[in-house]
Curated annotation (Swiss-Prot):
Chain positions found as Phosphoserine: S293, S301
InterPro entries: SUR7/Rim9-like_fungi
Taxonomic lineage of the native organism: Eukaryota, Fungi, Dikarya, Ascomycota, Saccharomycotina
Note: Present with 17000 molecules/cell in log phase SD medium.
Organism for this UniProt entry: Saccharomyces cerevisiae (strain ATCC 204508 / S288c)
Glycosylation: residue positions: N47
Biological processes, Gene Ontology terms: ascospore formation; cortical actin cytoskeleton organization; endocytosis; fungal-type cell wall organization; protein localization to eisosome filament; septin cytoskeleton organization
One Pfam family of this chain: SUR7
Protein name (database record): Protein SUR7
Membrane topology: Multi-pass membrane protein
Stretches in topological domain Cytoplasmic: 1-10, 136-145, 211-302
GO CC terms: cell cortex; cell periphery; eisosome; membrane raft; mitochondrion; plasma membrane
UniProt key word Glycoprotein: yes
Location(s) in or outside the cell: Cell membrane
Amino acid sequence: MVKVWNIVLRLVVLLFLAGNTLLLILMIISGATDHYPVNRFYWVQGNTTGIPNAGDETRWTFWGACLQDKDGSDTCTSNLAPAYPISPVDNFNTHINVPHQFISKRDAFYYLTRFSFCFFWIALAFVGVSFILYVLTWCSKMLSEMVLILMSFGFVFNTAAVVLQTAASAMAKNAFHDDHRSAQLGASMMGMAWASVFLCIVEFILLVFWSVRARLASTYSIDNSRYRTSSRWNPFHREKEQATDPILTATGPEDMQQSASIVGPSSNANPVTATAATENQPKGINFFTIRKSHERPDDVSV
């Protein structure tokens, strides 16, 4: 059952990485073509009637501003450029009939959208490489840590890009409304952007879970291998034998006479009693042993 759950979770992470990569690609190609469904992907749409060099409606996409005529046709080929800002002043090179907030907050619109453009590309690079390497982790577990690191950077840049672009689009919508012009956010584009952020969060959590679990499993396996190695019988290992304490007793003339008087001349004394008496004696170590010599009293050895 555990293996089944592992396979299911791996497939979920793989599916989320693939979906996240696809969402980022769809956002990046918005504005690159006039065909359906890509022409439905835009950040914000506003009424630009009366602004020179602009159409009746203008949609700001990832690559630039798409002009929409009254018949509903889109023209996205004339105003395309990398890091195209949501700024009618810079897009149409005019201040005439441009909403006032686009003029007073020109720098904010300019830098928010340009930085988000760069961050989206960086996020796509990290997420895309993470997706490719995660497929290879099924064959080699050495790439798991690298996938986690790359996905962490992808999560940070993707979230930053979506936050910056959402802020710029909301400010643009409010600027059109303050000038009594109609404007709306692109629901499809915003949905894909925040869906990619959600997928990044889920992917990051799952990858951290897998990394921590792999570390714990490796540590547990190492401990078990050490235990098994130490518990095996080694023919070249010899356990130390416990040395018995020597029992030394002092023997002298008086002791010999006392023992002789106790035992007596009879040779049929009970050896068990003598052994028990010997065991009951207090054990200790006497450093001096005196031996009696019949030849000379001076031959006493220490």
